[in-house]
């Protein structure tokens, strides 16, 4: 891989790195804390954690909104930056709600606070919405920024960094929690570790997300379009329902939706 695509892949990969870390913290840590330590019914925990996946269907809408922005303006970066900020803030809120659930359940003699649980579900739905918005714009940015020959190599590095984020997320939990990761750790030490994590992780996610797109799209505008060439802007002239109907003419899209 040449130096320019490699540098681009490493920079953009930081966004996927942050999502890998987030996935470990939500699916591996918060999910376990809700079921094992707080003893929330597994069904409710699954609804809360899985709520973010329900918003994957919003990707088409966010992608359409991004494509409708004039080519002379930043089309992808605002979505990615907004997504990064929202994910960082909402993860901090999710950690605080988990802590509140614990103290509330202890104070009420084991009764689950329905309001806090409902808020936690909404927060996870918000995280899923932010991931859908940022992830769609991120994929479009890669397509805008690379040629057809470069794209497979850039994507391999970018998604490889997603896997690296999973490993780093595990390391982050071990470093922040310390002895609270032990099987016989007390609940108070686990909650103290979660409190520390709610302060450290949002800053890390925010930093990775912002650095990943810093200057990328501004450079793209000048590099990818020859002087005097105005690209066809078909998505600006078609409504979202019309674009979705066009998917029916693509055999691969039909098979993919059938699998879903």
Task: Put a short name on every predicted segment.
Residues 25, 29, 61, 133-141:
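Transmembrane alpha-helix boundary/hinge residues in polytopic small-molecule transporters
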């Amino acid at each position: 891989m040449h130096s320019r695509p490699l540098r681009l892949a490493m920079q953009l990969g930081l966004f996927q790195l942050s999502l890998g870390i987030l996935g470990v913290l939500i699916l591996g840590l918060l999910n376990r804390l809700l079921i094992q330590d707080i003893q929330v019914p597994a069904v409710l925990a699954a609804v809360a954690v899985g709520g973010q996946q329900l918003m994957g269907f919003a990707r088409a809408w966010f992608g359409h909104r991004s494509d409708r922005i004039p080519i002379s303006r930043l089309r992808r970066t605002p979505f990615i930056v907004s997504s990064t900020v929202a994910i960082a803030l909402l993860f901090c809120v999710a950690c605080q709600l988990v802590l509140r659930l614990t103290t509330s359940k202890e104070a009420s003699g084991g009764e689950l606070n329905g309001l806090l649980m409902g808020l936690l579900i909404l927060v996870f739905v918000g995280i899923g919405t932010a991931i859908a918005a940022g992830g769609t714009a991120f994929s479009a940015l890669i397509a805008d920024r690379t040629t057809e020959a470069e794209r497979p190599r850039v994507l391999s590095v970018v998604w490889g960094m997603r896997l690296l984020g999973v490993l780093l997320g595990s390391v982050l939990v071990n470093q922040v929690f310390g002895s609270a990761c032990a099987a016989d750790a007390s609940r108070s030490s686990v909650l103290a570790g979660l409190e520390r994590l709610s302060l450290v992780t949002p800053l890390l996610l925010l930093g990775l997300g912002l650095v990943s797109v810093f200057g990328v799209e501004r450079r793209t505008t000048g590099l990818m379009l020859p002087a005097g060439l105005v690209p066809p802007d078909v998505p600006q002239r078609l409504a979202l329902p019309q674009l979705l109907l066009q998917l029916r003419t693509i055999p691969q899209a039909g098979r993919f939706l059938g699998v879903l």
